[in-house]
Amino acid sequence: MLMNWTDQGVKSVKDSPKRFDAARKLAQKGACELRDFYMTIGKHDMIAVLEAPDDEAAAKFVLSPARGGNIRTTTLKAFREDAYRKVIGAL
């Protein structure tokens, strides 16, 4: 999940760690796990690696923090190495 702070999010950036802690708990309730988190410099302000049981659970999780108005998200689905090898092997 690629994230950028909104103007509102930048104004309250000191609260960002608290919001992240709440997001981690929210992920767990939805059977998801925030595996990694990075603050970045460049096009995106933050990157989080979310593991979810299915696309629906991931979508529900992603929409919840975004509703607060502090971040905008861009999602992408990644394939682990074993899945990558399976896909390429089937070509």
Where are these regions (language model features)?
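A compositional/biophysical signature of low hydrophobicity enriched in polar/charged and small residues
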Residues: 2-91
